Amino acid sequence: MSRTRTSVSKSIHRRAVLGGMAAAGAFSVAGPYVARAQQGDINIGVLLPFTGSQGAYGPDMRKAAELTTKIVNDAGGIMGGRKFRLFFEDDESSPTAGLAATKKLLEVNKCVAVIGIWGSPIAMAIKPVLVNANTCMMVSGAANAITDGDTKGLVWRFQAKATDWGPAMAQAMLSRGWKTVSILAQQNAFVIPMIEPAKKTFAAGGAKVLDTVIYNPDQPSYRAEVQRIFGANPAPEAVMCLGLLTDFVSIVREEVRMGATSKIMALSIMADAEGKFIEAVGPDVAEGIEHFQPAPPLGTPSYRKFLKLMGATDDNALYLFAGNTHDQICTLALAMEKAKSTDSLVYTKEIPAVDNPPGEEVDDIIVALDKVRAGVKINFQGAGSICDFDARGDQLNRHFGHFRIEKGKQKLVQIIKGPTG
């Protein structure tokens, strides 16, 4: 079965290198990046999903962290020759497993930062432990609560926060001319904060929200929810789907089975997921589904340099999350170098000084380190984002990508600008 949608011109091709969960087998799930510890090594924990519902994202994030660390270490490291040593742990897409892994990184591996941290539930579970241990955490999770409360300045989000996703996604749907929409969303701390801001944007843009249905994760079936949303009379012109890959595969199969006519815009973590969605349902079923996500700085010198680092063979290759671990390693190196310290309470104070404007824009980590050592004020430009932060550690100036699946490929429709402050 297939859908017919309007074509767009610019193609984002899926890269072949280390794609999806299959690449997890190329690495041990946990272990040090450097075979032997040298005196003065700086231990960094990297907590990522390699298994479970979020496992598609771990391998490329690991690869980016390793390659970026190699660049820093091969150039002599930081603070007079100290090298980063990475310890990887699989959070299994589970807060319980993520918490156990974090404790190991702190207590056994003596890590001075924990980075990666893809899922919001995992981030929220480990946050109290890391903050209590006075250890920096750098996350890709979007739930607003991750940076709430007294974080001691230790929590840094390399991602747009959830309340910024909803309005931007609604704006993309309004740009398609849809006047009636419904929302089908998973019950979790990442998704729920998106809904009300999205509704306000729909209302301001003249679109009517017909219905909102919240479902639980890992339900055996989503038939009742799909029937209520897609089978309504009148049916919405489009449905905003907010959740994860595994539930979306079931939802799409169900709406195709019932012959639904409503268009779909989903989160890219549902409808892209490093190519896993198309693999699961096939290109015909996926045809025309639109999706939306905070995007890396596509087309910039920093992103082109990152594509080369990752071994991408196409200038339009799309990495939604791998750039985050690249940027986290770079930010740690720059902040520690500037602070001349590996104490999280000390070096995290220097993150705005190396990442935020004003300053000379630099996208090369070795050049950036040299300038920091020379006392030059820099504004580091990352591969996952331009790395600007507010006082709470939330990311600013993050843009969003609106994509459409056509003939088994992800095509960029437009870039939506996010909040600037």
Residue ranges and their predicted role:
Residues 10:
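Flexible coil/turn residues that form the inter-helical turn or adjacent wing/linker of helix-turn-helix
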